[in-house]
Amino acid sequence: MEKRKYINNIYIYLVMIFYNMNFASITYSSFIMRDFSKISWIIPILTLIPIFILILLYKTKNKVEYLQNIILFKILLLINSIIHNTVLIYVSSQMMGISFYQLTPVSIFALVSIVLTCFLSFLDINKLLRLALILITGLIWFVPFIFDFEYNNNLNMELFGKIDFKIIKGLYYTTICNDLFLYTLYNKEYKYPITKKALLIVSSIIMIIASLQIIDSFTLVNYRYYEELTMPSLNRYFSHQGKRFFEHFDILLLFLTMTTTFYKVPFNAILVKNTLNKKYQTKFLLLYFFFLTPLVFFLILNYNYLRLFLILLSITTFLLTIIIIIYSRKGENNVSTVNPTN
């Protein structure tokens, strides 16, 4: 039964690992390589300590219906979701415009992203997770195709020359590991719920891979190389094969960003939608994206406010994670009192 449980949930775990590891660890590793350089390889492993503590305190068997009755949880979830999606759509649209279509207004890419993600938000979570797995498969096929092109062995080609560091920072803030807890809020919709053991394994993989990426990058150049960069080109596994280099690392980063946007924006919206009565869910999604649109355009026109959005995202993410952990324990006790068979 235990093996069957993990086999049936394999697509969920693959999506969790990919969107929290292969993407977040790239940006996370870049920060610590630039700021800590010499000792940066050990920091992701040390980060596992607070993550493990939070997971061990968390009760994965809680009933999400209990959380949905907590007004503070619903408010924080809504605020966090809106800020998260605003930043993610803004970042992906900026990267599309900066990297490839400089003459096309960024607002066009933002509007297209909003329309597509709004449409995807009407899917149920299992269909969305399977779509995310298809996007991952597409990326796996995309990388070998790029490596068919040969370029000179030149490290300068790998730098993020035009993409502002604040935009890259937005990637990290929108891929932090509170998602691991948010996945469990969909437990009633999975065939088998996500277990605490699975969360521990996934978080370990995320941070171990981040450490390995840093160690491998230091075999390519000296750590002082990264101290001089605004945003170091990091993932050698993607950008380097023997004597060949992938010239435009931003193409791969853009693909990661866009696939993450088309998955995570609906993921966040569906989670908020599920806290409401079914007869209000369709209207809510339309109002949600109607309200989201001016926020994205505001950020496009007022670039300096990105820092404020990232600070608010960090605060709401932290508070939301703490509330989920606290009320998961109360929720379990509450449910066991009402229905001892669960």
List the predicted regions and their residue ranges:
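Membrane-interface capping segments at transmembrane-helix boundaries
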Residues: 3-4, 59-64, 325-339
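Hydrophobic, membrane-embedded alpha-helices of multi-pass small-molecule transporters
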Residues: 7-27, 43-54, 77-81, 85, ...
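Membrane helical hairpin/interfacial module
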Residues: 22-107, 112-116, 292, 317-320
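Membrane-water interface regions at transmembrane-helix termini and the short interhelical loops
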Residues: 34, 62-63, 91-97, 113-134, ...
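Hydrophobic alpha-helical segments and their helix-loop junctions in multi-pass secondary transporters
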Residues: 82-93, 137-161, 217-218, 321-333
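Membrane-interface loop-to-helix entry segments
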Residues: 87, 107, 120-150, 309-321
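Membrane-interface interhelical connector segments
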Residues: 219-248
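Extracellular/periplasmic helix-loop-helix junctions in multi-pass membrane proteins
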Residues: 280-285, 294-315
